């Protein structure tokens, strides 16, 4: 259920864009992200930092898009969010406090060097997505960018998540691998 809630704003943004335009879709994205926070809090009695940061970015850049009637702001939001994720992961790893390990370390007990590799992989992934977003957003038609944002980045993230799980699984201790089968 929680993962479905994460996709709610994206689905609403895409649907509203297809029926109206980027400006109405930006307003809908702000509303849908606020609704996501409300429902998440009602169901789970807590909010993750990632959701709060995303909501803040959506609200700021969505509002700027609407006020200035300029879709550049909503396009930049994607790159800025991915950049923040890359920076947060990279800094946490440099401080030997892996965010990924703190999130998944109880379920998947692998060596710190494996967590470091996975973390740097995600730093590169998020930074690359941010750069590719800049290219797609400002070199290709708006509709192409919307499709890339909704389908391309989502698919890339899901593929990378699966690859990460397989990589971590490969490095699990034998007894923990047996538990997961």
UniProtKB/Swiss-Prot annotation:
Topology within the bilayer: Multi-pass membrane protein
InterPro entries: YciB (IPR006008)
Record localization: Cell inner membrane
Listed GO CC annotations: plasma membrane
UniProtKB keywords: Cell inner membrane, Cell membrane, Membrane, Transmembrane, Transmembrane helix
Domain of life: Bacteria
Residues passing through the membrane, by range: 10-30, 50-70, 80-100, 118-138, 148-168
UniProt keyword annotation of Cell membrane present: yes
Protein's job: Plays a role in cell envelope biogenesis, maintenance of cell envelope integrity and membrane homeostasis.
Similarity annotation: Belongs to the YciB family.
Protein name in the entry: Inner membrane-spanning protein YciB
Native source organism of the sequence: Shewanella baltica (strain OS223)
Encoding gene per record: yciB
